[in-house]
């Protein structure tokens, strides 16, 4: 699929950001004994404060630590995408970062515009995934929109080998669709 197909959809045009948010190797997270050592590595830097990228809250941090290094790196990149998409659309408002089923979850609690997105690893494949409420039509819509450009797990998840390259734009659109799900549902 061409890049244009990823950016012009029913969900609107989205910015094309190719920044790599986490330059640090996350294998070092396990050897850090002190939370104060970990926070600067995952977003509590001046550069990310300028971008409005919040650090991973201390109560959420253990959920990321339970994943393998490669999975954690992909999931943290997806986390940044979620915040980037939310900041690019003023209708979404601020996000609440919480634990759901022991995994990081992102809710539009302020404006209630969207459906919860949860980050985790799909059990069968072992791939990092964006999990969506299975009672929504989100994943079916992604299948229709992106076809084989993305991998799916039933009606609940988009599987992610890597959050870079051409799938980056598709993933951003999936995130935007989830975070604005209730806006479209009302119209």
Language model segments and positions:
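Non-transmembrane, interaction-prone segments in cytosolic or luminal domains
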Residues: 1-2, 15, 60, 74
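Charge-dense, helix-prone N-terminal extensions
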Residues: 29-187
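Cationic, amphipathic, low-complexity segments that mediate targeting or membrane/lipid association
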Residues: 2-3, 7-36, 40
